[in-house]
Amino acid sequence: MSKATKRKHVVKEVLGDYVQPTEHQRIVKVLGSPGNNLHEVETSEGERFLASMPTKFRKNIWIKRGDFLIVDPIAEGEKVKAEIAFILYKDHQRLLQKEGLWPEGFTQDKTGVVTKENENNGIQSTEALSTAQAKEQGEDSETDDDSGLFVNTNRVHYEDSEEESESEEESESEEDEEN
C-alpha cells in the first residue's frame, strides 16, 4: 500500500468512525509531547503517565496539547503505561457526552473550555472565572478588537502609538510656525 493510500485510510478511520471505549480503555487528556512519539497524558482522576503513538498514526495524524484520546493500557509498562487507540475530536467528544460515557473529571463550560473539576469542594475550579469571562466577552463584543484577525508573519509589522503621532503633529506644527 502506498503512503498516500495509507494516509487516506488512516485519516478516514480517525475522522469518520465513532468509537466507544471498552471497559479496559480510558479517556485521557494530552498534556504535552516529550518526543519519540510519546505523549504525556492525564486521566480524569489526575494520574499522569506516558502514552505511545502506534506506527499507523505516525506522520499521518497530529496530536496537540489539550486533545483527548482513548488509550489501551500496557500492563508491563513502567513509564509508558498506555498506547493510543483513538483520537477524539469535538464531534466524538459531544457524542460521548450525550451517551454519558464522558468522564466526570473532564467537563466543558459554555465557552467550550475544558476544565478539571476541583475535587476538594466539588465545584468547577473555573466557575467564578467563567461568569467573569462572559461579562468581559459581552464588553469586548461592543468594541472593535482586531486581536482575533489573521496576522501575516511574513511582513514587517510597524506599530504606531497615539502618543508618537501626537508628538509628530506637534513638531510639524512648530516647524510650520517657524517658517
From Swiss-Prot:
Residues 14-89 form the S1-like domain. Keywords: Nucleus, RNA-binding. InterPro entries: EIF1AD, NA-bd_OB-fold, RNA-binding_domain_S1_IF1, TIF_eIF-1A. Its main location: nucleus. It holds the Pfam family eIF-1a. Residues 120-134 have a biased composition (Polar residues). Residues 117-179 are annotated as: Disordered. This is Probable RNA-binding protein EIF1AD. It comes from Xenopus tropicalis (Western clawed frog). The lineage of its organism: Eukaryota, Metazoa, Chordata, Craniata, Vertebrata. The gene is eif1ad.
